[in-house]
């Protein structure tokens, strides 16, 4: 046999046969290999393009027309690979992990396959979409974890493959290595980084042992023994397994937000361990987990509500096992309950618990995001405008109630989950419910970005406040919302009266009555243009509602429900300059 796929072969060694000539075959690898004689001889394909080539489509009508998918996106050729067009108007980012800070708007940063780490605001305060040019490169190599200092939004900790961790000062632009150098340690391709929820100067970093820095990576201490199985059959000198991929490493670490030093760790060879005293003593929990596959531990999530509660997920796709594995413990790992329930067949990459509602859980798997409102008894797909794709990481922004999903192939998606926080089985039995609206900042629009029109634009959040509501049954009429500034009604909105969960958007505006002279001038102007116009458009104008507090009344089926909401002043725009 002849090895032609390169070494290491990696996971994308696809074979593609030219539909117009069976003797022409391509093998995808770090570089694409090609044969023109049915495999007798092989050479590197004459593609002056690509690198880590994952996918190849060959036009059945024209073999010179091909589309190549690789680590930096995609390329299109019409001349057999001599020249390539690289379209940048598609969202094709392969994220491994995502983090956020507490600035306004908050920043999102994530690591990309062979494309470094990048950071941008979650919305464009200048108005319009999030431009390609508004992303900043904040790390190199294969980008992995990105975790912010949540106290002052100054420091970003990130890494490239196999653990080279750096600290970026977002105020000064200084970037420096803070890697703990010990050649005997093994780091995963995507080695976990954790900023302690109790002290933002304290950082944890996973190798085969857990590392702790008491002060921003200036120094490190080892706070565990080897937490993996360390099977000699999987280990080589400084590496694990075949090729250049290290094995027997920590893949996930979390600290209880309720108890300092209560740490959970999972490894790629199936170990799950916990310490209650910052690493002095560790307990191996494998035997307590029912039907434990001892596969790659994709996530351990410490509960925000109970220090003895945690969640656990495994991924078995490397073992050709595509069952979902999700567990929950309420007694520090002594017993575990399977909560995979009706999740589809497919590996689970991440699980998150909401910080306000302990029964509100989210899972990211190979198909997208799934939500449970009953603590994992049942799961529902969150599709909406999100295509089917693997979700490798998720975070929940505690102030904004946004779910941030990092996909491995279609970029980052953000969903407003504020309404879901209140959803319970009891609420769904009600006739109607008006969810608590979240206040919104009216951004100062300044510093517009120059951009290329052919680049991809991300979506900003609407410059509006959503009003979410639920109806247990059809009303046969619209639902109305009236916004009051004090005692004065300033805006009226209508929404669907059908059963289900709905949303209407208030554009943070107020209806202002024009003077008689202004109304007459408008009538004359529309008459000159020969246009018919509604009398309300003549009588009222729409103006931005001022910064301040408002009352919203929802009327549904003759019943009224009242909520408060605020428009916040943009006090942070100078920080963004």
Where in this protein do the model-derived segments appear?
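Surface-exposed loops/turns
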Residues: 92, 388, 498-499, 546-547
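Surface-exposed loop/edge segments in extracytoplasmic proteins
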Residues: 174-177, 378-380, 487-493, 561
């Amino acid at each position: 046999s002849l090895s032609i796929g390169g070494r290491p072969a990696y996971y994308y060694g696809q074979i593609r046969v030219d539909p117009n000539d069976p003797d022409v075959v391509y093998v995808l690898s770090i570089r694409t290999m090609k044969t023109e004689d049915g495999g007798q001889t092989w050479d590197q394909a004459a593609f002056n393009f690509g690198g880590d080539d994952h996918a190849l489509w060959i036009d059945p009508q024209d073999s010179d027309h091909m589309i190549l998918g690789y680590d930096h996106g995609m390329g299109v050729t019409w001349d057999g690979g001599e020249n390539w067009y690289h379209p940048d108007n598609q969202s094709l980012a392969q994220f491994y992990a995502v983090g956020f800070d507490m600035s306004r708007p908050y920043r999102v940063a994530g690591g990309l396959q062979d494309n470094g780490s990048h950071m941008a605001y979650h919305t464009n305060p200048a108005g319009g979409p999030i431009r390609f040019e508004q992303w900043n490169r904040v790390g190199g190599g294969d980008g992995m974890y990105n975790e912010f200092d949540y106290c002052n939004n100054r420091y970003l900790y990130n890494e490239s493959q196999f653990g080279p961790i750096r600290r970026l000062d977002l105020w000064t632009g200084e970037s420096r290595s803070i890697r703990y150098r010990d050649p005997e340690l093994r780091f995963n391709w995507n080695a976990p980084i954790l900023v302690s929820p109790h002290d933002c100067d304290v950082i944890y970093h996973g190798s085969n042992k857990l590392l702790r820095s008491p002060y921003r990576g200036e120094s490190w201490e080892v706070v565990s023994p080897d937490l993996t199985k360390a099977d000699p059959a999987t280990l080589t000198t400084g590496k694990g397994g075949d090729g250049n991929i290290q094995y027997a490493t920590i893949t996930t670490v979390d600290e209880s937000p309720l108890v300092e030093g209560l740490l959970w760790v999972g490894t790629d060879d199936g170990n799950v361990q916990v310490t209650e005293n910052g690493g002095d003593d560790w307990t191996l929990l494998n035997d307590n987990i029912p039907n434990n596959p001892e596969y790659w531990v994709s996530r351990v999530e410490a509960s925000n509500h109970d220090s003895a509660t945690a969640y656990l997920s495994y991924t078995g796709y490397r073992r050709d096992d595509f069952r979902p594995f999700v567990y929950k413990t309420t007694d520090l790992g002594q017993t575990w309950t399977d909560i995979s329930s009706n999740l589809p067949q497919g590996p689970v990459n991440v699980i998150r618990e909401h910080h306000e509602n302990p029964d509100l859980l989210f899972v990211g798997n190979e198909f997208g995001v799934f939500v449970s409102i009953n603590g994992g008894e049942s799961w529902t797909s969150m599709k909406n405008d999100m295509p089917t794709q693997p979700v490798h990481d998720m975070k929940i922004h505690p102030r904004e109630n946004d779910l941030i999903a990092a996909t491995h192939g279609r970029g980052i998606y953000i969903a407003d989950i504020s309404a879901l926080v209140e959803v319970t089985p009891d609420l769904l039995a009600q006739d109607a419910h008006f969810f608590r609206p979240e206040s919104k900042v009216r951004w100062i629009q300044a510093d517009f970005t120059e951009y290329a029109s052919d680049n991809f634009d991300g979506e900003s959040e609407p410059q509006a406040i959503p009003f979410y509501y639920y109806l247990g049954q059809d009303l046969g009429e619209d639902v109305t919302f009236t916004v009051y500034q004090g005692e004065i009604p300033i805006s009226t909105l209508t929404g669907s009266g059908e059963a289900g969960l709905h949303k209407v958007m208030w554009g943070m505006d107020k209806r202002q009555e024009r003077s008689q002279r202004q109304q007459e001038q408008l009538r004359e102007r529309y008459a000159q243009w020969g246009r018919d116009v509604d009398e309300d458009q003549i009588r009222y104008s729409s103006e931005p509602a001022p910064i301040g507090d408002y009352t919203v009344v929802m009327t549904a089926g003759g019943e009224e429900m009242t909520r408060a909401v605020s428009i916040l002043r943009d006090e942070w725009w100078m920080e963004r300059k």
